[in-house]
Amino acid sequence: MNELLAEMAAVSSRRKQSKPRRMSGEGDAMMSPIDLSTKSFDENNCEKGAGGALPLEDRSNILPHFSVPFANPQQFLSLCAQLGNSSSRNVSSTASTTSSCPIQSCSQSFSSPAALTWHVLDAHEDEQEIFSCDVCTTTFSNGQDIREHKCQKTLASRSTSVPPSTIPSSVCFLSTPTTPCLQFSINESIGTSEIREEDEEEDMDVEDGEHVANQLFGHLLQKSDDKSKMASLFNHAFPPFAAFPNMPPPFLMRQPFDPRADVFAAGRHDNDDDWEALMEISTSDEAEKIRALVGDKAVPTTDPNQCILCRRVLSCKSALQMHYRTHTGERPFKCKICQRAFTTKGNLKTHMGVHRSKHSFRGLPISLPPQLAAMHQHQHQIAPPQRIHIHNPPTSAASAAAAVAQIQASQQCPICQQRFLNAGELAVHITEHRNSLTQPPRVMPTPTTTRVQTFPFVPFFTTPPSLNATDMSTQFNLANILSAQLKNDSSPNTDTSSVEEKITRDDPPKMASLSPSNSSDSSSSVRQDILESSEFEEKLKKLEEPPILEQQVSTTPNPKNENPLLAMQKMWAETEPPPPRQMPVLSKHQCGVCFKHFSSSSALQIHMRTHTGDKPFKCDMCGRAFTTRGNLKVHMGTHSWQQSPSRRGRRIFDVASSVTEKPMLQSPILPTSGAPGASPLAMLGPNGLSGLEMMMMLWRTVCSVCQKVCQSPNELEQHLKEHLNNGSSAAPTPLASAATPPPS
């Protein structure tokens, strides 16, 4: 220690400006000393000395350590120490040997390197290449470049497997990685301050002015950003605890990112009725369509919200954009469920209410007692949806018609208009629709059930009232109940089976199978699918053939062998009326016939006219009727005889009254003289026609040459041909002679 002090005293010409730093042993392993040596690092001196301390370099210039907020303060202080080095020629420093300003135009000298550094940073801020790095010999012009400097050589050396204890602190601090060096912390500053106090007790010759300069230097360094200071404190104030050597650094204690969070976030929806996925928004260029309609000769508008096509002034820019869609026909908002398009998103959201409501299903089948209805409902709730099968094929034309009617009574999905055989399949299909609404946009799910496409859809009534047919599954249930009651009967099995066979052939749509053997073995027997076209056609061919067994049984009737079940069925059908049909619960704007949903009551009212056949708007010209007034207006355009600008914009219902009030002025075919004469309107007679219809008849039947009133358009055509053949000097008709005033 004394030898090192002697060397330092020989080098320093003025006074001792710094003192060597003592390295801590194993007990102070957590406090790394700050070495401000200006000499390049000698790898031969990296070996540990006695006592576990590293030997110091022979020349050093150490300043009191201040807790500064720079990203790498040791590098900045090391460059400041180069300015105070006086006689060493081996250091790469551009500072003068007498602590004078290195700038040639400035002749000031300072008592300490801290004061010199203050002067250089304050007065010569714009000078080039004042400071340099000891490791990579990079030059700097200001302190900001020094703080942002990252030495690449030391970064490469730190990637090796050299233990941190064998690397001097100067190299560690000169290297500026992305994150500041871990050895710099508040504990180190506290430890170095204690060492400085011990050195100051040993070296009492340090002047008080140097402490003042150091305080000013520390105040200068404290002018950096508060954010970097707080980041430095949080990143380096707490070193790893000695009792847990395997603990990672503090910045690695952060909770790792869990990729499963995005998976759950993607599948989570705040609202089950999120219909945005079912809305398709087109991004076509509407301005290009408007330019195509306007053309090259566009007249400039006088208002920013004026339509360039029809010169209509709108209230705002958005209203103008909506108005342009009436010209271009653009409908950018489309429903993915029914493929309908709308001009505004609000209209599309209103339309989505048609699909938003929970769809009601059909009630229970007709003509079922309460016990069987409850059993039927319980079976449909438990049993999975299955296709309808029959055990015994029908054997008559009436039974074939009943089977066809049963197939025609299919269920239809109100969303995608798919048809199904029973309400169970429809319920499963609509449940898939509801489940798909909360998922990302994908292809609409297709059910695995069989779709009915070959038969038309019967909207409400499942079967015609004349056939008295019930559901096939209900027939099987009724057959099982009645056959169970037959087990207690004492009648012979042979007679019962023969009569049951007759009953089966006589009335198959009412009773599919009545024998106990057939009812018990119906589940194990092979059932033929009626949806297969080839087999179904064969069954229909067999139905047309007269059954032989039926003729044999009918030729030899036996009243004693009459089945009591048939009598019970006839009694039930004749005496007890069928219970009323259970109507489903409808939504606010849902049709009770086809169960379609509508957005408003007016739309539902117009739709109901398609079921009732009501057409309240009738054309007075041709007698055609329409369900809406708009359709009638479009139809009246076919009867218009002129499209003059004076008539445009007028209501079609006001034309008749105006024509009736001023017939002489509106009709160009009538004589203009004021002489009394019979007008064509008067010649038509009071036939109860309206004024508009009378004008149309005049236009079609009155000659424009001689004003003759013909009885039909064909007669008028023949009359005009006569004018063409005979010339324009044809004799005037009695109408023209009567209308012409006599000469005075």
From Swiss-Prot:
<dbReference type="GO" id="GO:0048333">
    <property type="term" value="P:mesodermal cell differentiation"/>
</dbReference>
<feature type="compositionally biased region" description="Basic residues">
    <location>
        <begin position="13"/>
        <end position="22"/>
    </location>
</feature>
<dbReference type="GO" id="GO:0014016">
    <property type="term" value="P:neuroblast differentiation"/>
</dbReference>
<dbReference type="GO" id="GO:0010628">
    <property type="term" value="P:positive regulation of gene expression"/>
</dbReference>
<feature type="region of interest" description="Disordered">
    <location>
        <begin position="542"/>
        <end position="562"/>
    </location>
</feature>
<dbReference type="GO" id="GO:0008270">
    <property type="term" value="F:zinc ion binding"/>
</dbReference>
<feature type="zinc finger region" description="C2H2-type 2">
    <location>
        <begin position="305"/>
        <end position="327"/>
    </location>
</feature>
<feature type="compositionally biased region" description="Polar residues">
    <location>
        <begin position="487"/>
        <end position="497"/>
    </location>
</feature>
<dbReference type="InterPro" id="IPR051565">
    <property type="entry name" value="Sal_C2H2-zinc-finger"/>
</dbReference>
<dbReference type="GO" id="GO:0048626">
    <property type="term" value="P:myoblast fate specification"/>
</dbReference>
<keyword id="KW-0804">Transcription</keyword>
<feature type="zinc finger region" description="C2H2-type 3">
    <location>
        <begin position="333"/>
        <end position="355"/>
    </location>
</feature>
<dbReference type="GO" id="GO:0000977">
    <property type="term" value="F:RNA polymerase II transcription regulatory region sequence-specific DNA binding"/>
</dbReference>
<keyword id="KW-0677">Repeat</keyword>
<feature type="compositionally biased region" description="Polar residues">
    <location>
        <begin position="551"/>
        <end position="561"/>
    </location>
</feature>
<keyword id="KW-0539">Nucleus</keyword>
<protein>
    <recommendedName>
        <fullName>Spalt-like protein sem-4</fullName>
    </recommendedName>
</protein>
<comment type="function">
    <text>Transcription factor, involved in positive and negative modulation of transcription. Binds to multiple DNA sequence motifs in the regulatory elements of target genes, including homeobox selector egl-5 and LIM homeobox mec-3. Involved in cell-fate regulation in multiple lineages, including neuronal, mesodermal and vulval. Required to regulate the fate of PLM touch receptor neurons, acting via negative modulation of transcription of egl-5 and mec-3. May modulate gene expression by interacting with different transcription factors during neuronal and mesodermal cell development.</text>
</comment>
<keyword id="KW-0479">Metal-binding</keyword>
<feature type="zinc finger region" description="C2H2-type 5">
    <location>
        <begin position="589"/>
        <end position="611"/>
    </location>
</feature>
<dbReference type="InterPro" id="IPR013087">
    <property type="entry name" value="Znf_C2H2_type"/>
</dbReference>
<feature type="compositionally biased region" description="Basic and acidic residues">
    <location>
        <begin position="499"/>
        <end position="509"/>
    </location>
</feature>
<dbReference type="GO" id="GO:0006979">
    <property type="term" value="P:response to oxidative stress"/>
</dbReference>
<feature type="zinc finger region" description="C2H2-type 6">
    <location>
        <begin position="617"/>
        <end position="639"/>
    </location>
</feature>
<dbReference type="GO" id="GO:0072326">
    <property type="term" value="P:vulval cell fate determination"/>
</dbReference>
<feature type="region of interest" description="Disordered">
    <location>
        <begin position="725"/>
        <end position="744"/>
    </location>
</feature>
<dbReference type="GO" id="GO:0042692">
    <property type="term" value="P:muscle cell differentiation"/>
</dbReference>
<feature type="region of interest" description="Disordered">
    <location>
        <begin position="487"/>
        <end position="530"/>
    </location>
</feature>
<keyword id="KW-0863">Zinc-finger</keyword>
<feature type="zinc finger region" description="C2H2-type 4">
    <location>
        <begin position="411"/>
        <end position="433"/>
    </location>
</feature>
<feature type="zinc finger region" description="C2H2-type 7">
    <location>
        <begin position="701"/>
        <end position="723"/>
    </location>
</feature>
<keyword id="KW-0805">Transcription regulation</keyword>
<feature type="zinc finger region" description="C2H2-type 1">
    <location>
        <begin position="99"/>
        <end position="124"/>
    </location>
</feature>
<comment type="similarity">
    <text>Belongs to the sal C2H2-type zinc-finger protein family.</text>
</comment>
<dbReference type="GO" id="GO:0060290">
    <property type="term" value="P:transdifferentiation"/>
</dbReference>
<dbReference type="GO" id="GO:0045944">
    <property type="term" value="P:positive regulation of transcription by RNA polymerase II"/>
</dbReference>
<feature type="compositionally biased region" description="Low complexity">
    <location>
        <begin position="728"/>
        <end position="744"/>
    </location>
</feature>
<dbReference type="InterPro" id="IPR036236">
    <property type="entry name" value="Znf_C2H2_sf"/>
</dbReference>
<keyword id="KW-0862">Zinc</keyword>
<dbReference type="GO" id="GO:0005634">
    <property type="term" value="C:nucleus"/>
</dbReference>
<dbReference type="GO" id="GO:0000122">
    <property type="term" value="P:negative regulation of transcription by RNA polymerase II"/>
</dbReference>
<feature type="region of interest" description="Disordered">
    <location>
        <begin position="6"/>
        <end position="32"/>
    </location>
</feature>
